[in-house]
A protein has these predicted regions:
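Structured catalytic-domain cores with a bias toward divalent-metal coordination
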Residues: 1-203
């Protein structure tokens, strides 16, 4: 079965990098987010791997980059969708937030006509997230805070606890969802998500 995402068709056994274009700068230059898709020849679940929701959390970005560089994202069955940097503005400026001062992880699921951060959340939630059967989101300790490597999951979820044990981080932390976060949006639509935290931002 072909996967049609962001207007592009990807067949089983194919790989493709698609540009997720959601806004223009004042110079009319498009702002594009690379979306790396790998499909096995055998059908199976789709795993969405993201990082860089906060632009200064570069450890997560590098983890996803290494997953791609080492071909860990090539599945035996099913599909992987990798987005190393969701907040390109923040990443380029080494800033947690968007240029409008908003935190992308506090505006989900976003609105079509809202702030820049809200529009990114909206189009990501509408155009990419529905394809995911499982989500894995990589973060780094914010505001120069060091976080021990850990997986954060929603409390009282046997499925997430099982997935966390498979990931096998040194710590599994049961944390309630924060309003308007990516994790909360996944929870509301019934898509399991593991959130990884590790290290310190800007390092």
């Amino acid at each position: 079965t072909d996967l049609v995402i962001l207007g592009e068709k990807i067949a089983l056994g194919q790989s493709k990098t698609i540009n997720f274009s959601f806004a223009k700068l004042y110079t009319s230059s498009k702002v594009e987010i690379p979306v790396i898709i790998q499909r096995a020849k055998t059908p199976g679940p789709t795993v969405l791997i993201t990082a860089g929701i906060h632009g200064d959390e570069i450890n997560g970005v590098e983890i996803v980059r290494q997953i791609i560089a080492r071909k860990i994202n090539i599945p035996i069955s099913g599909t992987t969708i990798c987005i190393p940097i969701l907040n390109t503005f923040g990443f380029l400026n080494a800033d947690r937030t968007f240029p409008d001062g908003r935190d992308l992880n506090r505006v989900f699921p976003g609105t079509k006509t809202g702030s820049l951060a809200s529009r990114v959340a909206y189009y990501f939630t509408k155009e990419i997230l529905p394809f995911a059967d499982y989500c894995l989101d990589f973060h780094t300790g914010g505001a120069q805070r060091f976080n021990a490597p850990q997986i954060r999951i929603t409390p009282k979820s046997p499925e997430l606890l099982k997935l966390a044990s498979i990931f096998n981080a040194p710590f599994t932390v049961h944390v309630s969802n924060i309003s308007k976060s990516y994790r909360t949006t996944c929870h509301k639509i019934g898509t399991p998500i593991l959130l990884f935290e590790g290290g310190k931002s800007q390092s």
